[in-house]
Amino acid sequence: MPPNPMHEIDTDADHPATQVEIEVVEAVAAVDAAQWDACAAPEAADGGRPYDPFTTHRFLKALEDSRSVGVGTGWQPAYLLARSGGLLIGVAPMYAKSHSQGEYIFDHSWSHAYERAGGRYYPKLQIAVPFTPATGRRFLTRQGHEAAAIQALTQGAVQVAANNGMSSVHVTFCTEEEAIAGAAMGLMHRKTQQFHWRNDDYACFDTFLSALSSRKRKTIRKERRVAQGFGGEILALTGADIQPEHWDAFWHFYQDTGARKWGTPYLTRAFFDRAQDSLRDDILLILARRDGRYVAGALNFIGRDVLFGRYWGAIEHHDCLHFEACYYQAIDFAIANGLSRVEAGAQGEHKLARGYMPVTTHSLHWIADKGFANAVAEYLDHEARAVGEEIEILTSYGPFKRTGTEDTPE
């Protein structure tokens, strides 16, 4: 994407003197880490854990330093900055995209239709965490400047796209509050769904199981027995317990899954070296070891209130080990650490039977071509209704006890 000069945006029609400067930078290292995190993770200023580990300066820098994003990847960093009176009041992890891979909010049909009509869909702008279908803030604002910064970043992204002749702007897995604010500014609000586990103040895993129907309790207990009887041990590692040898093993698992799902893994081997150096405290790594070697693993990231499940892989098949490593170990960790939610990534109706319930996820979209935008808006209206109906149906099939029904003794 061509360099975009700094420009000003008026963020308050009633007070025209309120000006915010918008700038695009092509490396997160161009922004002081403390200043970025003052917007991305103000709650962590005292050394605590950020709500969202994926928008921190250290995570985005690890993606860049490892060349998981950048030249040749189709994810070209174009971070959006908003300043008022010289103070950085907002940032957004924005990328110029030359494809639609690694986003998990699917617009392939849009791109095909756009190009069949004679348009050029790529490059487009994506405000997102690369390869990460985790929900969270996408317009990262300094406390006390939220409204002005969100408005400036939203308008700034659209202006950057328009100035550079780009087809569209996409803000994926944003918060519902951001989606509502963006829709009020003329962007299109898209609703999709994922499966999340919620912690209803459970004291332990058995307390969680007691909230389920008898049949589902029995199934989960059986799956855990089968998985834990695979002939080895399951390790839950975080912080200083994670060592380079663990990444050597996990890389093999990740490569296998990446090759089968995407053709090529999105993250490079160097990313896991960066994770060892600067991200270990943000990570929960579940590894299964048998006969002295690691045979499977699941990578999770830890937020202040949420555990985010990201990657699973294995070099041996063992019944139910996937469920144990990805879902049940995550629930154990969330309960033990007082986390309110586990996000288990994109798709997967099999998660429902294991206590992960359907929830609405949100994204925002702006398309330069008005005729095409109108067609997409009509499609999104139909899609939102279908998603709402699907969530209602799936919820009715959930594993939890029905109110007013008697449970069968075990």
Language-model features: locations:
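N-acyltransferase acceptor-side catalytic subdomain
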Residues: 1-410
